[in-house]
Amino acid sequence: MQPINGNVIHTVNFMQGAITIVMALALGEALKLFVTSRDDRPLQWERLPALLAFVFVFVPFFQSISQYLYLTYLNAQTAPPFRPGFLIFDGIMYILEAACFYVMAGALAPRHWRHFYGAVLVLMTIDIVWSAITYRRGIHVGAWIFIDAVVIAVLGGTMWLARGRTLAMMLPSWILMVTLGLTTAASYWLESAIYFP
């Protein structure tokens, strides 16, 4: 076990910067696909439910990543004993999660709902793996496993029920928005110690 030192701080700051860049690009892409340069229709209103769903999951992920890195690696009062392998693991998992946001951002159009759902399902699966390993480390993130499982069940169930069928164009977007809105509220309530230490 190593103490927190300048090299660790530099590495965490580098990782957080890389994650921030990818997530900022994803947010920019999502906004660009909602607000277009078309004179006849600058706002793509049919994409609003998917954009809101994107924001509902984007904000808590971005905030929790920042808080987790600070509490786990930068704050000597809350940091567990430092192990380089966990820092590498966290960095890899967070970059993979950020990449999922970029894929989600490109699939806001209602006709691409399966791509959006797929990216959310991959994101939640990655987060379950990360949460399970982090929980075994002794860091309280257990509620996220349950929340991610609920999202997987609802979206996976919707995809399964929709196989071979044509759903009303906006229905999957509304299901997504409501599911992610409710699970985000639950996340903030159940994991408030990480979001607001």
Give the positions of each predicted feature.
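Helix-loop junctions on the outward
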Residues: 36, 61-88, 104-108
